């Protein structure tokens, strides 16, 4: 079993008025050379939580942190015009909270952060995307 001490929340950086399925996400990651989706979990706009990668395997979502983290991504993050925005639906907010609380229970002492907290240099154009923190979930 891997040592986990970090839960990293991402957005898919897709427009909130468009559908971006777990299949779309996986296909995009395969095109980028990954072996599959880089995130362990994906939360759709309707709140469905999709398991994309076994927790026993490191993710491909936060360079330098993958070996000790779990990647959670929610669908959206951009408004209808493509501008960064907190587009989480009430369903996504609920599912994200439940999932994170379960993960924190399974991996006590883990820290919760947004992807922007680990690689702000890579997210300059999306710096204002709201990736939830522990305080906004609990």
Regions found by a protein language model. Give the residues of each.
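Short aromatic-enriched loop/helix-cap "lid" or pocket-rim segments at secondary-structure transitions
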Residues: 55, 124-127
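Histidine-centered divalent metal-coordination motifs
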Residues: 10-11, 115, 128
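Active-site-adjacent loop/helix surface patches within enzyme catalytic domains
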Residues: 2-111
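Single conserved hydrophobic/aromatic residue that forms the stacking wall/gate
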Residues: 127-138
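Acidic carboxylate-rich catalytic motifs and surrounding loops in phosphoryl-/glycosyl-chemistry enzymes
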Residues: 110-120
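Residue-level detector of flexible, active-site-proximal loop/helix-junction positions
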Residues: 56, 119, 136
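Short catalytic/ligand-binding loop motif for oxyanion handling, primarily in non-cytosolic enzymes
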Residues: 16, 120-123
């Amino acid at each position: 079993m891997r040592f986990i001490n970090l839960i990293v929340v991402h957005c898919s950086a897709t427009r909130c008025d468009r559908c971006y399925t777990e299949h779309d996400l996986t296909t995009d990651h395969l095109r980028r050379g990954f072996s599959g989706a880089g995130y362990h979990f994906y939360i759709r706009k309707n709140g469905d939580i999709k398991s994309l990668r076994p927790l026993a395997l490191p993710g491909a979502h936060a360079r330098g942190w993958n070996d000790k983290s779990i990647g959670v991504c929610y669908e959206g993050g951009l408004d209808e015009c493509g501008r960064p925005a907190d587009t989480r639906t009430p369903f996504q907010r609920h599912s994200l909270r439940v999932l994170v609380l379960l993960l924190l229970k399974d991996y006590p002492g883990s820290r919760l952060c947004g992807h922007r907290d680990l690689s702000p240099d890579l997210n300059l154009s999306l710096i204002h995307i709201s990736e939830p923190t522990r305080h906004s979930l609990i």
